[in-house]
Amino acid sequence: MNKFRTFPQINTLIEDESLKSYPFYIKAFFCKKVVAKLKENFSQDEISKDKLLLEIKKEIKTFYRKDLQSVINASGVVIHTNLGRSVIHEELYEACKDIICNYSNVEFDLENGKRGSRYALVLEKLKMLFECEDALVVNNNAAAVFLVLNSLCYNKEIISSRGELVEIGGSFRVPEVIKAAGVKLCEVGTSNKTHLKDYEQAISENTALILKTHKSNFALMGFHSEVNIKDLHELAKEKGLLSYYDLGSGWCENLNEKLIKNEPKIKKLVQECDILSFSGDKLFGSVQAGIILGKKELIEKLKQNQLLRMLRVDKLTLSFLNESLKAYLQKDYEKIITLKLLNDDLSFIEKKALRVQKELKFQTQLKKSKSLVGGGSMPDKSLDTYILTFQGDALKLQTRFRKENIIGRIENDEFVLDFRTIRENELQKLILIINQMENL
């Protein structure tokens, strides 16, 4: 006897009136999923159709909520990797809209009617902004590291300090990327101290390159030392090797003066090594991309690598990056939202917080606090900010606000909203959402 005979037929569930408004493929998928799940945990109790439909509707609602949605970043982390890192300014989006929604000359030369280079759109601007010989763009900085090493050092050896063999988000480790690129790693120095002589003594006939990796997502304090890229480049040049700086983050122009100490400036570094790469969506404040700058002959080798086809960027990335570069070249820094949020002064942040506090129907306290740069950038630096704190169970409040797409944080056992990362055009929306919430 079939023990599942009490289960309603799948077709009966799909055709039920209460699911009529949902697309067929979606309701069919979840009807099958819920029934299969109940069969796995089968008990002899009779399964009612109403109970199944209730569970199916719950699954469908959860599915719709899982769509990519805009959130209000009240966490105080400016470059929040889990929230998409840098935000694109509305005017930059509008400038890209015509390209994205239509055919474009992404790889077509309008002057001669022949195939063109998809990188031509941004190459001139990158060379202009950073004063480098040549440039290339791939889909992120991990891809940039992989491409550089695979193109220039395949089946050879590179030298790197033990103190710079970092792990970035999602458990991606520099040594693993090096290995995957077909390159042998020679580690030198210790976790806290590496000297120039350590690199020099490690050079062998199989050495191709000296790698320096910027410690952008952690800070070494106390008894430590490292070798700067300029000295490494001079050593590499003397020994007939290449020097490569995996910068990861790095800044371009107009950054808050409190942040720039010990944080490398890209334009300066590109003159001090053969090749470097960094992320487009960190301190540069644009779209996700791996931006590679360096000597022309080295970039040409990268362009000849068959892997570039797999790592190339699409017209969306190129369009947004192009508009960001134009904003930098025109010194229109207000359009680089990451820079704006990092540069906003304390009085402006206080005004935003006071405006919201005044219009909320719930009691809050205004306090000074600290914001973080985030995105694996400047881990040892923080920025003054203002927060609003809410009374009540902090964890429950955090969950309530998160369900309304407001991402705050818990500080000193209180749920808080940090106004450095809440943009001015989000304030009224924030007020409306909170005032509609009940029993805070």
Curated annotation (Swiss-Prot):
The keyword Cytoplasm appears for this protein: yes
EC annotation from Swiss-Prot or TrEMBL: 2.9.1.1
Pathway: Aminoacyl-tRNA biosynthesis; selenocysteinyl-tRNA(Sec) biosynthesis; selenocysteinyl-tRNA(Sec) from L-seryl-tRNA(Sec) (bacterial route): step 1/1
Stored PANTHER family: L-SERYL-TRNA(SEC) SELENIUM TRANSFERASE
Catalytic activity: L-seryl-tRNA(Sec) + selenophosphate + H(+) = L-selenocysteinyl-tRNA(Sec) + phosphate
Protein name: L-seryl-tRNA(Sec) selenium transferase
Signal sequence segment: none
NCBIfam families: selA
Phylogenetic classification of the source organism: Bacteria, Pseudomonadati, Campylobacterota, Epsilonproteobacteria, Campylobacterales
Functional summary from the UniProt entry: Converts seryl-tRNA(Sec) to selenocysteinyl-tRNA(Sec) required for selenoprotein biosynthesis.
Gene Ontology molecular function terms on file: L-seryl-tRNA(Sec) selenium transferase activity
Top-level class of the enzyme under EC nomenclature: transferase
Keywords for this protein: Cytoplasm, Protein biosynthesis, Pyridoxal phosphate, Selenium, Transferase
Species annotation: Campylobacter jejuni subsp. jejuni serotype O:6 (strain 81116 / NCTC 11828)
